Curated annotation (Swiss-Prot):
UniProt-annotated location(s): Nucleus; Chromosome
First-listed, main subcellular location of the protein, grouped into a coarse class: nucleus
Superkingdom field: Eukaryota
GO cellular component, one term: nucleus
UniProt key word Disulfide bond: no
Organism of this sequence: Dendrolagus dorianus (Doria's tree-kangaroo)
Name of this chain's protein: Sperm protamine P1
Length: 62
């Protein structure tokens, strides 16, 4: 079983490498743009949520 598993992963990695390679330049740009937009939105939302939360806790404690 262990031997089979190892060979399977090898293979798999080989297939992945070929594919990456090939569409790395094409999706590179698209991936970067999507990531940047998502990150900025998430950061803003997270900050507001945590703030809030923090201020609420402080009020309750006092």
């Amino acid at each position: 079983m262990a031997r089979y598993r190892h060979s399977r992963s090898r293979x798999r990695s080989r297939y992945r490498r070929r594919r990456r390679x090939r569409s790395r330049y094409r999706s590179x740009r698209r991936r970067y743009r999507g990531r940047r937009r998502r990150r900025s939105r998430r950061g803003r939302r997270r900050r507001g949520y945590s703030r809030x939360r923090y201020s609420r806790r402080r009020r309750r404690r006092y």
